[in-house]
Amino acid sequence: MTLPDFRLIRLLPLASLVLTACTINAPKGPGKSPDSPQWRQHQQDVRKLNQYQTRGAFAYISDDQKVYARFFWQQTGQDRYRLLLTNPLGSTELELNAQPGNVQLVDNKGQRYTADDAEEMIGKLTGMPIPLNSLRQWILGLPGDATDYTLDDQYRLSEVNYHQDGKNWKVVYSGYDSKTQPAMPANMELSDGSQRIKLKMDNWIVK
């Protein structure tokens, strides 16, 4: 279907949303080998998580637009997840619900859109080419389909480089939340050319 040319409202940044380097268990020292048993065990532990949720600050920055928001990400089952973007006043600007074969997005005017690919739809409706299909793995600290990545000294992802469909995404992790088991990302930045996506996770609930 042809999707309308909708643009997410530009949200005013607040001091509370400034994304700074995380000091929670930040990566340091020389990286570890991707072939290490500790890394394989960490991946297995993360993949066992069936349900999880996280919330925090989101920023999308490019030559054309800057968007700052709060986000809430909830996964309720395999390939079933919900993404909310809210403004500083707490009002919902975008709600996306995805399940296999069906994606629904509701904008800040209550307009509902449906499609079968979340990544394509959110890109067309908001003008933000967010790599949702890969981000679902990256936000967990997993490389997804990427084969070019490095680990930190705690056998967790430190950097990912992924090339697909003319995009060259680089993902850098600058902190992990060690209060959760397994440790989950607390700060990450995605970049492709002049585009940057920053995520700062306030907390995680994992099951």
Curated annotation (Swiss-Prot):
A lipid is attached at C22 (N-palmitoyl cysteine). Its main location: membrane. Keywords: Cell outer membrane, Chaperone, Lipoprotein, Membrane, Palmitate, Protein transport, Signal, Transport. SUPFAM superfamilies: Prokaryotic lipoproteins and lipoprotein localization factors. Pfam families: LolB. A lipid is attached at C22 (S-diacylglycerol cysteine). It comes from the Bacteria. InterPro entries: LolA/LolB/LppX, OM_lipoprot_LolB. Coiled coil: none annotated. It is found in: Cell outer membrane. One of its GO terms (biological process) is protein transport. It is a lipid-anchor. GO terms for cellular component: cell outer membrane. Residues 1-21 form the signal peptide. Monomer. Plays a critical role in the incorporation of lipoproteins in the outer membrane after they are released by the LolA protein. Belongs to the LolB family. This is Outer-membrane lipoprotein LolB. It comes from Citrobacter koseri (strain ATCC BAA-895 / CDC 4225-83 / SGSC4696).
